[in-house]
Amino acid sequence: MNNIIKRFYKWPIRINEINKNNKDLIGKEIKVKGWVRNIRNQKSVSFIELGDGSSIKGLQIVGDKDSFSKLKYGSSIEVNGKLINSLGNDKEAIEVQLTEPYKLIGNCPDCYPLQPKNHSFEFLRDIAHIRSRGNSIGALLRVRNKSTQLIHQYFNDNGFINVHTPIITASDCEGGGEQFQIKSSLDTKESMFFGQPSFLTVSGQLEAEIYACSHSRVYTFGPTFRAEKSNTPRHLSEFWMIEPEMAFIDLNDNLDIAEDFCKYLIRNLLDSCKEDIEFFNKRIDTNLLSRLEKTLSTPFIRLEYKDAIQLLQNNNHPIKWGDDIQREQEKFITTHFGEIPVFVINWPKSIKPFYMRENEQTDHSNIMPTVSNMDLLVPTVGELIGGSIREERYDKLLNTINEMGMDKDQYSWYLDLRKYGTVPHGGFGLGFERFLQFVTGLQNIKDVIPIPRHQNYCKF
């Protein structure tokens, strides 16, 4: 039994601990609390399956034929009994034999929306406040939780400092204009609360650069917001981003770190969330495990943007140099390379944000200048990571700001980072929810965040 259970001995033992330590607990009296996930009544005996959210596997409770006659699906109960080896055909299975009547904690009426059957994800989105009691969202929450721990562990082990960047900002990192503006009840036509327009952040990158230029390796992991009027399986208005920022690196370093980070997360999730990912492989996407294992065993492809355009043109995709790559084209590229993640690098400057470092033009056949950047495309999801080397040259950055018609005074602080001891630096942003889609096989991004926020949906 782990130290937490020992220290807080009044807590009921959790089901995942029972499954993990059942050899030590066989024959012992235990107390378990949870929700009823299944009820089966037979002639001389009855069974319930109890779940407490700690494991995809429930715990079978055995009583006599009348033990659970009044119990309803979804109710919360306390059980006291002896842990025994199952009397059924599965000799590895365990169960709890009641030694006293269960204690009802919270009854669940017949109108309970979740029933012991398969519900559509669309239905579950309408009951987001209780959908986590089902297997799919319950498993997702455990994978999400472990992923969060692994993210912090990876950066801590590699000497990064975690920076809490602001949620409220005056900057638009991506330049798309899809920001939520903040207005206070104290705002008037003459004065604003912050003295200037302020918004919910679309990225912590610009602020993270401040600390990369003093502490070399930093990362931020927090919520970001986009006022996108899109109610699609790929869009959320509130989502989470992991954004490392590093001094003294080039594009190849950035690519190496991004690939290593992704593989670290996947490798450790396959080990620590094995049962949950096997559940997703069985119930959601039967190719999930093989795809993840292939991702681990194969180097990611590195493909120049110009070569990606040529590949698409050769396969009758309507695209030309200077165009962005669309979702279906992303899917084609990863499929073409055998369902392996693909970095597309060195994109046209004109379709990327202002802060990306302009490449030296050695190939004068290009119509437009390019920037030192990368987009990581992964099977089934599309773009997972966007990153770049940042423009560290003061004059180059100032020229780009002027060319794009931006207010240079608003970005004077950002230019100062280049004025005082500038260094080459870069980083990337990984969309947390898209990563969770990749490792679970869930197709709708609204199903991988606990409480989704999107256009026309903010119930609670």
From Swiss-Prot:
EC numbers on record: 6.1.1.22
Keywords: Aminoacyl-tRNA synthetase, ATP-binding, Ligase, Mitochondrion, Nucleotide-binding, Protein biosynthesis, Transit peptide
GO BP annotations, alphabetical order: asparaginyl-tRNA aminoacylation
InterPro entries found in the cross-reference section: Aa-tRNA-synt_II, aa-tRNA-synth_II, aa-tRNA-synth_II/BPL/LPL, Asn-tRNA-ligase, Asp/Asn-tRNA-synth_IIb, NA-bd_OB-fold, NA-bd_OB_tRNA
Catalytic reaction annotation: tRNA(Asn) + L-asparagine + ATP = L-asparaginyl-tRNA(Asn) + AMP + diphosphate + H(+)
Record's subcellular location: Mitochondrion matrix
GO MF annotations in UniProt: asparagine-tRNA ligase activity; ATP binding; nucleic acid binding
GO cellular component: mitochondrial matrix; mitochondrion
UniProt cross-references to NCBIfam families, sorted A to Z: asnS, PRK03932.1
Family statement drawn from the similarity comment of this UniProt entry: Belongs to the class-II aminoacyl-tRNA synthetase family.
Protein name: Probable asparagine--tRNA ligase, mitochondrial
Organism per entry: Dictyostelium discoideum
Lineage, uppermost ranks: Eukaryota, Amoebozoa, Evosea, Eumycetozoa, Dictyostelia
Gene name per UniProt: asnS2
